[in-house]
């Protein structure tokens, strides 16, 4: 995956220990409940979260500890509040997380991208021994894709989310 200055400061913490996964799941569920009202407001405002998707989110919160593995994607260091540093920092780690998801898929493993655990980042760090100078970014629950029917996810048409030459402008004919 691309990384700023080719530093490869990413780190991947793979959780397979049942007790650690259970602790992580408890923090995740706590975050899930705290975010319930915000999620509902966002869904109402944007119309982007159908009921079936809400069920998927609840199922993940309820069953996170049952996943064969949880991968906590981290980056060494902590970005300060300057935009330039944050752009380079997250621009270095997020492609690595996505590349890992693609690699998992080629091996018959499914994963999903979530950052909900970050509401309780300190507690997560204490549970897993993550040093203070390491930034947690994404949690990837990983599971086997038995009998999975892979199909494109429902998405808006590209013309609805893509603009040409200025915000809101349709593609020139």
Enumerate the predicted regions with their spans.
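Short, electropositive alpha-helical surface patch
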Residues: 124-137
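C-terminal helix-cap and adjacent tail motif
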Residues: 137-173
